[in-house]
């Protein structure tokens, strides 16, 4: 969604979104360690670290896998987020922001949006930022069993089985061409490169932050 729509919602002009929760997503464990959040964020925005939903230790064994359902639920409730909360996310790295959005939807949050263009687009639209740290009010009941959408996740074992035995199943890599070809792992802390056996390339962008291949020449 656009910065203009979000500002309208925050001003009370979007029915049903009067109490929207806005969150900046980044890779720091805590808001005080996040340079971008400290520099200036959307007014009222709380801080959410990717470590609240995924294993972000950088280990090759479990890197970026979802945390357990009970941990994710606990972290959501700590921000006052339930299945009925209207959530808007933004962040400097769209990949991390999208993974948090996915985790929220998997858990059961029914309305999750991402600000198109993030804080840069917000500021370009002429809107103010603030440096005051914000925190949500803890909620007690998420409102549904977590995950509400277990079908949005599959294990490595299930994926391998479907690649081998289900002609209607496609395991699609959306990584860069160099990652697809095994020329690089894409991470400076991981040596292993390549793709799962049987995967097809979805013609991902040049980097995780590049969307040029998905837009018209004029943007």
Question: What is each of the regions a protein language model found here?
Answer:
Residues 1-219:
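Cytosolic catalytic domains that perform sulfur/thiol-centered chemistry
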């Amino acid at each position: 969604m656009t910065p203009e729509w979000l500002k309208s919602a925050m001003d009370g002009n979007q029915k049903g979104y009067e109490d929207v929760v806005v969150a900046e997503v980044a890779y720091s464990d805590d808001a005080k360690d996040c340079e971008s959040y400290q520099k200036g964020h959307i007014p009222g925005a709380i801080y959410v670290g990717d470590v609240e939903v995924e294993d972000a230790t950088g280990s090759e064994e479990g890197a970026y896998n979802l945390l357990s359902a009970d941990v994710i639920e606990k972290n959501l409730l700590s921000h006052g987020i339930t299945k009925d909360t209207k959530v808007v996310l933004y962040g400097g790295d769209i990949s991390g922001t999208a993974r948090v959005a996915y985790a929220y939807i998997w858990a059961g949050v029914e309305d999750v949006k991402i600000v198109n263009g993030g804080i840069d687009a917000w500021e370009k639209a002429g809107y103010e930022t603030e440096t005051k740290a914000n925190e949500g009010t803890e909620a007690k009941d998420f409102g549904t069993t977590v995950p509400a959408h277990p079908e949005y996740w599959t294990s490595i074992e299930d994926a391998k089985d479907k690649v081998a035995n289900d002609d209607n199943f496609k395991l699609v890599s959306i990584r860069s061409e160099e990652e697809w070809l095994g020329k690089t792992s894409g991470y400076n802390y991981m040596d292993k490169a390549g793709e799962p056996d049987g995967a097809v390339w979805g013609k991902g962008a040049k980097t995780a932050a590049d969307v040029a291949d998905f837009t018209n020449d004029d943007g």
